[in-house]
Amino acid sequence: NVNKKAGKAIKQNLMRILFGRLHYNAESAGIGWVTVQRNEEKIKEVLTAAHTNDATVPDLQNHISNDVFIQIVNSVIRLIGNAYRYEGNPYDDEIFPRDTDAEFRNLKSKDPIRLYIYACCDKFGIPYERRNGRQTKMPNVLGQAVLDYLKAVGNKQMFLKPHTLKVRCVSLEEKGLICPNCGRVHLNLSAGICSGCFRRLDDNHTIQVEKLRSNTDLMINVVKGRPVCRLHSEELSGQTDNQGERQLEFRDIVRIKSQDSN
């Protein structure tokens, strides 16, 4: 029980840093971007699967490269994280994986992931059908390929498992793209589409990673070159008769059953 409680708190804090709002996330702070294992065989499989099963469906390999596909996957990961769809999220009684989440068609018409995928399809000339209305469930070959790839690397039902994620860190000399419309920072190229407002990104609006890091307190110790320091904490809990037991139970690191004489 203690391990579960401590593990959940660690995951929550880690994911909060990776997918936080405004300047408090990995990309906006100049740390890097969240990605998953790259498997070329799996990429080819998901890009061609729909066309192989139905020749009338577009062959995605004729429209996007593997590099662009991974950029799209990375941005969808960011959007999933922004929606708290990850293991150990603070709203796990409301946000959890469902069987219907495995299908792109079940996304709401205004879901950010759906809108981002549509913008990518428009840019790369991938045909798709789009309708308005809450009752209309529209599939999308690119969107489904992204979800299928995430499932293949351990993140099924559009729900992230922290142990499957990787962070591609950036150096001070690298640059990020800034959306000219909403100002969102992208260290991942995002296939040239903003994952915030779904407008086009361009090379005329960039920012140095060094400047990003100086603008947020998440990286203040790195920017100032401060050495690693030891964290010291004091007990602030109330006093009890049994000092030894109290010390062991402090911060729930070890739990002692009151009836256990040992």
Each predicted region: which residue ranges?
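Helicase motor interdomain insertion/brace
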Residues: 1-259
